Amino acid sequence: MLFAFCGKRQAVENLFAGTLAVLPAPVRAFWLATADLQAGASQSAKRQFDELLPGADPVLRTAIERRLSRISIPPEPFDATAERVVENAATEHGHEEKFGLQRSLFSSRARATQILIALNVLMFAVESYLGGSDDGRVLYRLGALFPPAVRAGEWWRLIMATFLHFGALHLTMNMLGLWFLGPFVEFALGFRRFLLVYLLAGVGSMATVMAISSGANAESLTVGASGCVMGLVGATGSLMLRSWLRENALAAKRRLGLMLLIVSMQVLFDSVTPHVSMTAHLSGAIIGFAAVMILRDRLKTPATQQLTVKS
């Protein structure tokens, strides 16, 4: 616990509010007291150690007694170089926390993602009930994109097609993508802006497919949330690019590289796989990227929260 031994209580609290929240309460209290001790607040640290001691297990008890034996020894001061190292470490960790993609699907901040997954699964159940998700007549009836029908006035197909899937594997792959990316993008944009980007990417990708359809493709059905999910890939890339430029966050730069890799692999896969719409995937990613570039996000660190390593 670098930050605890450096007396940086706020940084330790940030760790316990994030990745280390799973640690037992006595362990967290021990390290917070250690941070206070190293910061020179020996009386506060002693009080916390004394409160922990009666209920501590043998390992924790030994560690507490070791700290108490040094309670009267003043901590060694840090020079400017050491302070910079600690500040850089705290900044890098903060970026990893903020730009990490491991947001929980079951968080209260992922309501839109939960709703979208539920709607996609529900529509797949309806497909199966009416005759099967691989039955073209069923898909057409429920709203698959069919360019002649859309040109005849059935514009609602541009939306409905994004909630239909051809087979369980198609549904599973798209829902995994939504599960992986949705909570982070929703956290960054908020409920309404997230839904706006998701639907813009989906409808926009379907409209692009229809606009450039010709020959045999003009008479084919198109379904799937792939354009929406690729829109989230583009949205994530946009958020990471903005954060990298705004905060010089290396964590955001690395995630941006990951999004570019995903798009590249998707293009490669589409180019060698029949009956897969590269047009929908690429247009969805581009729309998602462009939409987020003009929307506000919630990832910017307020000035009052930037110096998190001060004692």
Positions of the model-derived regions?
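Alpha-helical adaptor scaffolds
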Residues: M1-V22, V27
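Sensory coupling linkers of modular signal transduction proteins
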Residues: Q43-S44, L60
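Structural marker of alpha-solenoid helical repeat scaffolds
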Residues: A21-V22, P54-G55, V59
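A detector for small-residue-rich transmembrane helices and their helix-helix packing motifs
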Residues: L15, V27, T34-Q38, Q48, ...
